[in-house]
């Protein structure tokens, strides 16, 4: 019968003794091995008191100095970092034994501290001096628990340490707190200790027990490099004007660096930090010392990096970035007038001393900037280069090319320009130029035919452009690119101002099938230019671009088609009343067209004049900077701009022009439906039937002109016209204009026959406010009793046979309080009723003028001479118009017909129904209309 060793007390006691003896032998061997390793290593310095963090054992879950013994196999997978050189380790076996029994003899992090009484912990036997090699560098009595303090566990209950009483543990706790206070450490933070007590999976300490998560972060903050970095973070710096932004993921050590910089600013929306450029150098140097952090530097920001001699010492001591150096300053030179420039730069004592050596120096107390004459520019820049801590950016190369010219010229860019010889140009055109227009032609010729003519609207850019192009007539054929709504207006302008030019030599491109090079003068729209790009070879030598701001976006098809043509053309004449609608970036394409060598790259232009800022998605050029310098550059070599207020004394009070509508020309096939019906000239028809056919012809003309009217209004809106009036007669035209403005979300008012008196006054008052507003008005309902002097442009979409009504409508703008010259535009369509109404209006105005009853003379103010050839058929229709409108009551019949006209009730393509011409309008309705008409024609 065998006896189980577990049931026999004697065998159990002997087994325990053998196990304990073997364990002690193993511990002794490991301790000897550890001592041998320690003898091979050089002596290490002791850790300073600022590195020690005391911990309350009661809060950490341990029992004072107890530790968990680990299996050697498991400890091999722990952290492979080197042992802390600042921790204490015994050099001899005697020291190892004494550190457990005589704590007052143990070297601590506070060498000056001597415990008042000897503390001996009961239950600790000498064999424990041979402690496991996993914890030789731990100060069990000191303050370095954060460097891998051994944690207690339930497995230690079977060891002799379990018999330790609570009284010695209290003494040990008091001893640790006393030692911590004597080292000058701050009081404990319970929240920090609670975080330290939590286990972390980021790594293990040397003994194999879990290291708190806070430990690694504290080491990074203290400047102690880690041997192994778990992961890495990459980011970049983004320039944002005078500041820069850091885009990187969260890192506690990097956040601590951010908070130490004085110019820090945190954006909660984007969750990013940004700083002043003065802190760029310290931040980059501090980031380089953080393990696992990689920041991509700014482009061209080497000047903001500090020298190692000024910052390396501070960073080496604290591990944080040093204060920014105040010795380094950066700025730029900016042109402020045609003779002076200023230095826009921060304060520097050496630089101020240099400024005071300049003879032409001036200091502006308001702006706190120094300015100098351009003649001292080279001298100043040469001396500034000798200052090592100063970076003063020079003027752009483009401005330096004109430095001598800027110094010699006067304040006005056209004052000293010599008179051009215009003997080769038609005398009619030269004699018609106003003085300021002649100065504009001289400026263009002085610029060798390349300029941006940006005169205000109504100052005669068209006649100046034709005169400039005629000066270079030997270099024709000429290409004229215009909005589609004014193609035929330009055709008539060439015919009027250049009598020597054969009208057959003028080629107006209407469709994509037309040839672009068939004429000596070729007129094409922006949209068709992109479709006829293949016909631009060989290129034109002389090019006119009307409304050149249409090319402001380099990405559009019209701009891509026009820019190569303009760069190779010898003469480029750009016309625009509003060259830039909202920001300087819109000027770049026009500057590039006139002067391709000024700013070949847009980025250089954007940095200088658009306040370019780098954003996460790219560069933002929507801002503005150095606008005064840009204005001087444009006036000197690119642009000529005069406002109405500058030349008001040379302008007439009211200028009337007519604009052609291409609607009738662009319609293929047989006669369009708005052509005069054949029955209008038939003698066997009654007078009433002829009148009704005339009314139908007038109504269909209104419907046919709608697309051209809307196209012209849209061109005005795109040109930046904020306030203008549009007059029309038919309700269908007023509805179409209003609908288009609503679709474009353009603020406007409307006054017609259905508008009440109260609403009329409200609309007129709202139109006088400063905001952008357009007016859609009826010729007969809004030609009296209203004031719209805040506008200076009137557009007549339709004609009216009574010139007195038209003059009254014009005077809604040309009234007392009008400080500008008023422009009147009449939209006339060839091949419609306008062919007969326009000469009729001129004839009546001429008669009134001879009698002294009218100051307006359409024949002199417009280009309506020989508007149509009076063949037999047209002469009969003209006589019918003239005779019909001279009879009493016919005005009211025509007004009533126009008011009741419904384009949907009759197909304009159907033949005229004779049955509709037999009856007259109902008298009751006519009387009601008379009552309504009297309410609008009676004086207020």
From Swiss-Prot:
Classification via PROSITE patterns: HARP, HELICASE_ATP_BIND_1, HELICASE_CTER
Residue numbers of N-acetylserine PTMs: 2
Region of interest (Mediates interaction with RPA2), ranges: 2-36, 11-36
GO molecular function (one): ATP binding
Keywords recorded for this protein, A-Z: Acetylation, Coiled coil, Hydrolase, Nucleus, Phosphoprotein, Repeat
InterPro entries, per the entry: HARP_dom, Helicase_ATP-bd, Helicase_C-like, P-loop_NTPase, SNF2-like_sf, SNF2/RAD54-like_C, SNF2_N
SUPFAM superfamilies: P-loop containing nucleoside triphosphate hydrolases
One cellular-component annotation, GO: nuclear replication fork
Annotated segments matching region Disordered: 1-155, 662-682, 899-918
Helicase ATP-binding domain segment(s): 442-597
Pro residues composition bias: residue spans: 669-679
The keyword Flavoprotein is annotated on this UniProt entry: no
Short sequence motif Nuclear localization signal: positions: 641-658
Tissues where this protein is expressed: Expressed in mature oocytes, 2-4 cell stage embryos and 8-16 cell stage embryos. Expressed at lower levels in morulae and blastocysts.
PANTHER family for the chain: DNA ANNEALING HELICASE AND ENDONUCLEASE ZRANB3 FAMILY MEMBER (PTHR45766), SWI_SNF-RELATED MATRIX-ASSOCIATED ACTIN-DEPENDENT REGULATOR OF CHROMATIN SUBFAMILY A-LIKE PROTEIN 1 (PTHR45766:SF6)
Name used for this protein in its record: SWI/SNF-related matrix-associated actin-dependent regulator of chromatin subfamily A-like protein 1
Organism of derivation: Bos taurus
Taxonomic lineage from the root: Eukaryota, Metazoa, Chordata, Craniata, Vertebrata
Gene: SMARCAL1
